[in-house]
From Swiss-Prot:
This is GTP 3',8-cyclase. It comes from Actinobacillus pleuropneumoniae serotype 3 (strain JL03). GO terms for molecular function: 4 iron, 4 sulfur cluster binding; cyclic pyranopterin monophosphate synthase activity; GTP 3',8'-cyclase activity; GTP binding; metal ion binding; S-adenosyl-L-methionine binding. S-adenosyl-L-methionine binds at residues 42, 83, 134, 205. Belongs to the radical SAM superfamily. MoaA family. The gene is moaA.
Length: 340
């Protein structure tokens, strides 16, 4: 299989977040809520169900402290995730706070697009530099069948508006499923031919609540990869702060294709990201442990040195790879709880 070159990208600070396997971490995925208003059949088919005990999500000041600590340790990119992060009433304040943190160069947002048409201008003003939005189908009825919401046309208008106000590229996520997404591949290719969209197909991942759905719908991204390579698409080099997608481009297309294939051998070798949940727990892997509590060190600015020390110490416990290939998805019942 064709290998992907990785660009040697310099940084202003040398990251101190380096694990036992010499992987460097410059990318934080920060969940600010686990609430989601969609009912996607691959994630929350029965909708969001609040826990019996009340949860207090990270406050703006706690978010400021955790992002500052990561930035001080070399993190350059923060992705704000959920659940659906834009459901928080203080989302714009959070985005602005993250964007104003010294050392943070990119503030990305992962969203279901529910409020994109209405609020995209405000997101940009708050400091959101990059957007990933989910579009699992370009067919209105199919989209509603997958997500439980009749919002496709509004989301597409939101994407168009993003280009109008100066976003140079939008990343669009679709979960790769035999019955739903795979038959629409040609339609997606037509859509991105003249639009600077990176269309990212994410392999369906097995989680505790979705075993039977996974067995029925899982499709390897390699099948898509081989087809694209045969049609003249070419793999592109990756920058240090890039996510896990293998990106392909074609001279006849303005858009790109990204493939996220967690079951592929060596998927974890280039891991560059850590996760903090909306409840203030550090997760070293999407499919991993219960999480390491950080919240007791987020109350005061004077705790930053202790917080950074805990982050560095915890990182040494990060495993070399996940165990998805043997059916072990860790404790993860669904991906909404930590933002994927």
């Amino acid at each position: 299989m064709q290998s992907i070159p990785i660009k040697n990208v310099g940084t202003d600070n040398i990251s101190q977040l380096i694990d036992r396997f010499e992987r460097q971490y410059v990318y934080l995925r920060l969940s600010i809520t686990d609430v989601c208003n969609f009912r996607c059949n691959y994630c929350l088919p029965d909708g969001y169900k609040p826990p019996s005990h009340k949860q207090q999500f990270l406050s703006v000041s706690e978010i400021q402290r955790v992002v500052r600590a990561f930035a001080d340790l070399g993190t350059e990119k923060v992705r704000i995730t959920g659940g659906e992060p834009t459901l928080r009433k203080d989302f714009l304040e959070i985005a602005h706070t993250v964007s104003q943190t010294n050392g943070i160069k990119k503030v990305a947002l992962t969203t279901n697009g529910y409020r994109m048409e209405r609020d995209i201008d405000l997101w940009q003003q708050a400091g959101i530099t990059d957007i990933n939005v989910s579009v699992d189908s370009l067919d209105t009825r199919q989209f509603q069948l997958i997500t439980g919401e009749n919002k496709l046309q509004s989301i597409l208008k939101g994407i168009d508006r993003a280009f109008e106000i100066g976003y140079r590229k939008i990343k669009v996520n679709a979960v790769l499923m035999k019955q739903y997404t795979a038959p629409e591949l040609d339609k997606f290719l037509v859509w991105i031919k003249d639009k600077p969209i990176q269309m990212r197909f994410i392999e369906l991942m097995e989680t505790g609540e979705m075993d039977s759905f996974f067995q029925a719908q899982h499709l390897s991204g390699q099948s898509v990869m081989q087809r694209l390579l045969q049609e003249g698409w070419q793999l592109q080099p990756k920058a240090l702060s890039d996510g896990p997608a293998k990106v392909l481009s074609h001279p006849d297309y303005q858009g790109e294709i990204g493939l996220i294939m967690p079951y592929e051998k060596n998927f974890c070798a280039s891991c560059n990201r850590l996760r903090v949940s909306a409840l203030g727990k550090l997760h070293l892997c999407l499919f991993g442990e219960e999480g390491i509590d950080l919240r007791d060190l987020l109350s005061e600015d004077t705790q930053q040195a202790q917080l950074e020390a805990r982050l560095k110490a915890a990182l040494q416990g990060k495993r070399e790879h996940h165990y998805l290939h043997i059916g072990d998805s860790g404790i993860r019942n669904n991906l909404a709880s930590i933002g994927g």
